[in-house]
Amino acid sequence: MRNAALSFMLLLSGTVAAAEAPAPEPPAAAPATAPAAPIIEHGHFDLSRPEIQSFVDQVAAQGLDRGQVTTVLAAAEAQPKIIESMEKPAEKTLQWWEYRARMLTPLRIDGGAQLWREHKELLDRIAIEYQVAPEYLLAVLGVETQYGRTTGKYHVLDALSTLAFDYPARAPFFRKELGEFLLLTHEEGLDPLTVRGSYAGAMGALQFMPSSYRRYAVNADHAATRDLWNDWADIFASVANYLHQYGWQYGAPVLADAQLVGVGALTPPEHISLNDSLGALRARGLIVDTALPDTTPALLIGAQQQDVMSYRVGFQNFYVITRYNTSPLYAMAVHDLAMAIKQQLGQEAAL
């Protein structure tokens, strides 16, 4: 059906609600015992299923044409591989030393430095406007997609439909994102049947979920649409806007290394928060490589090396990075890549 004459854009039957989308829904808390992943078959969805009919009702209430929505969903295909990928993301299966080795490669460091050289004026302007250092804008891009090289091979419609209707553990979140995707494709003039992204439905060089795309993407050069695949001005400004909106503090530290003295081990908190203070962590035996005062909100992070557990302490800007991806491994990789890119440019300037 996808190869038939279905390359249309969604039409509105009325005013599409929400020029500004609501904030992305936080991930649902994991149950005490995780349910087994559902077993699904590849193929089109049965649109008579009550949950699909309810979804159509919900998006139609937001102004989308019911018939057009039904036609688009009829083209969606359930993808068993998507469920498999959701069950084993790299951030959950790798130790820090393994994850860091994957992310801090010469390709990513050199690529970030090269992109900075090519777009220095643009990056400097955006950094000033949004008060976010350029190296962190580049590092998010590097970790996410190697600067736009790997933006995903799945049809986003398939990915979001599979997770919305055949992945009970996160179904409410992904049904919301599927609705946001249908609204987004209309607003940006995209064909919902051809947009590709990750197995989770993230799109473009920044891997924004549809709700984040609608809320945080910026039309920096005032073109017809917000293009997060090919337009560097939109890409840089959008990641800067995302970090800025979540409370990035310009010039403030992200991480500090720490050493544990006189205690066997410390257990990092299960959930990402800044409920601790530097003083409280120091009182538990941590020597933290920073001159920040004891009252500074802080987060203990475990960074497993090959043969020993090391510790780091995250601050407000670390927390902001985890709003992009809640894994502390991800946020540490973004920080370390940012430092590596900046160091490489500094070394080149010294020659």
Model region roles, listed by residue range:
Residues 258-351:
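C-terminal soluble interaction/assembly domains
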Residues 75-79, 143-147, 340:
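A short structural micro-motif
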